[in-house]
Amino acid sequence: LRLAQAAHPPFGNYMAAERRAAVRLHRTSGTTGQAMNLALSARDCAVTEAVGGRCQSASGLTPEDTVVHCLNYQMWMGGLTDHMTLQATGAMVVPFGVGSTELLVRTIQEVGITAISCTPSYPAVLERVIAEKFPGLTPRDLGLRLGLFGGEAGLDDPAYRARLREVWGMEPRNANYGVSDVFCNFAAQCEHDTRLHYMAADVLWPELIDPDTGAPLPLVVG
């Protein structure tokens, strides 16, 4: 895909619709190489938000929640598009973004936020800022009941989950599993299991293809 975009900028030679059908542009993070441009049609946006909303709902987000979204809004799908998946649950979404951690702590206190959407490493940053800038305040005092995590590894460690429950008093969930150039969020955990539920079966059909023959191969566990 990267080679196709380099040869046929900016979207490659594999777009499934005319350029004028695209209404939103995102880019991948580029952490493993050249960032890729992602073009979404209005229908792409709607389907992506619906599937991601299922994931957030399965992880426990409800219309009664106020959730602060603390991922990067600068072109990455984790920002605006994940924001819209949170909103699809009926929850009130606070579009905070990254940085300004002191302001985030005050915002959580003042607005009555009940859930946070962020990377698994961000609670440690919050803990440090609370300890340094808010004497007498503990993470539990913020009243967050639910942590919706994605964008990084680490949440599969049972000890880390246990620590989040103990220090924050919130339930940690892997709520945001996806691949930007397919769906930004198509799998999530629920309250009963730490494994991921696949939430896009009606719109995304996974296949394993032999690159030489183009023939489908059987999917096996292992």
Annotate the PLM regions.
Residues 28-31, 67, 116, 178:
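Conserved S/T- and glycine-rich ATP-binding loop of Class I adenylate-forming
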Residues 57-61, 85, 139:
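Glycine-rich helix-loop-beta junction characteristic of Rossmann-like nucleotide cofactor-binding loops
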